UniProtKB/Swiss-Prot annotation:
Primary localisation category: plastid
Entry's EC annotation: 2.7.4.3
Lineage: Eukaryota, Viridiplantae, Streptophyta, Embryophyta, Tracheophyta
Compartment(s) where it occurs, according to its Swiss-Prot or TrEMBL record: Plastid, Chloroplast stroma
Amino acids binding ATP: 74-79, 188
Transit peptide feature, positions: 1-59
One cellular component (GO) term of this entry: chloroplast stroma
Protein name per Swiss-Prot or TrEMBL: Adenylate kinase 2, chloroplastic
Length: 283
């Protein structure tokens, strides 16, 4: 899932940014000022080239990246998160994985979470918010930066995270047609030994030995997928309104390399703007 191509010319990224001028009459070199500068500058996108081998990119003399990625079930978030974390060294935090681990533990919260997930409903905030908060607060997340996958899924969850002081630098949205999403979900399989995700059609297992041990997640049936999509569609606009000035929308119905090229272009430019911001402010 970390494959790449030599050269990709990505399609234009639809970028949504707040155009109002900063309210402050002057800037300092604080984190708030740098974040404000990024949010209010006009951004131009240029094609990104994916090298044959990724190298970790560090943001010198700046705060670590804080990224959120959102999309409907099977929109490709997991694949893109692997590519992003491999290149940028961020800590990948999947709300779904946190919930599934809680369910596997047999705890009361896990039992309650499973009941809601089986119905295609959002897990109550009081269960999941603290799980995500605790993971974001761990040392590795604070030092390396984080990539929050599939969360927040409602305006109330976004508000709770903001109240705890967690604000992303960029909010990435993957958009894929619904019929393709259903096909992706139903054909998805999990290797319980390695944790790797396969797809019976698009990414089949390498050997028969792996094929016979694959399992389907309990929430990956067509019926539950449709319920989850309905819930996602009902909540996504409210979430986007919380991050409209830092949101980029990516067409996810492309090859993983093409999708990553668009994301990589945005992240690389964000790092470049951060690293050049001090000299710009002093000039």
């Amino acid at each position: 899932m970390t494959g790449c191509v030599n050269s990709i010319s990505p399609p234009p990224v639809t970028l949504y940014r707040h155009r109002a001028s900063p309210s402050r009459s002057s800037f300092s070199l604080s984190g708030d000022a740098l974040h404000s500068l990024y949010r209010h500058r006009r951004v131009s996108r240029s094609p990104s080239i994916i090298a044959p081998k990724f190298q970790i990119v560090a943001a010198e003399k700046s705060e670590p990246l804080k990224i959120m990625i959102s999309g409907a079930p099977a929109s490709g978030k997991g694949t893109q998160c692997e590519l992003i974390t491999h290149k940028y060294g961020l800590v990948h935090i999947s709300a779904g994985d946190l919930l599934r681990a809680e369910i596997a533990s047999g705890s009361e919260n896990g039992r309650r979470a499973k009941e809601h997930m089986e119905k295609g409903q959002l897990v109550p905030d009081e269960i999941v918010v603290m799980m995500v908060k605790d993971r974001l607060s761990q040392t590795d997340s604070e030092q390396k930066g984080w990539l929050l996958d599939g969360y927040p899924r409602s305006a109330s969850q976004a508000t709770a995270l903001k109240g705890f002081g967690f604000q992303p630098d960029l909010f990435i949205v993957l958009e894929v047609p619904e019929e393709i999403l259903i096909e992706r979900v139903v054909g998805r399989r999990l290797d319980p030994v390695t944790g790797k995700i396969y797809h019976l059609k698009y990414s089949p297992p390498e050997t028969e030995e792996i094929a016979v041990r694959l399992t389907q997640r309990f929430d990956d049936t067509e019926e539950k997928a449709k319920l989850r999509l309905k819930t996602h569609n009902q909540n996504v606009s409210d979430v986007l309104s919380m991050y409209d000035d830092i949101t980029i929308k990516i067409e996810g119905n492309r090859s993983k390399e093409e999708v990553f090229a668009q994301i990589d272009s945005s992240l690389s430019e964000l790092l470049q703007e951060r690293n050049t911001a001090p000299s710009s402010l002093l000039s």
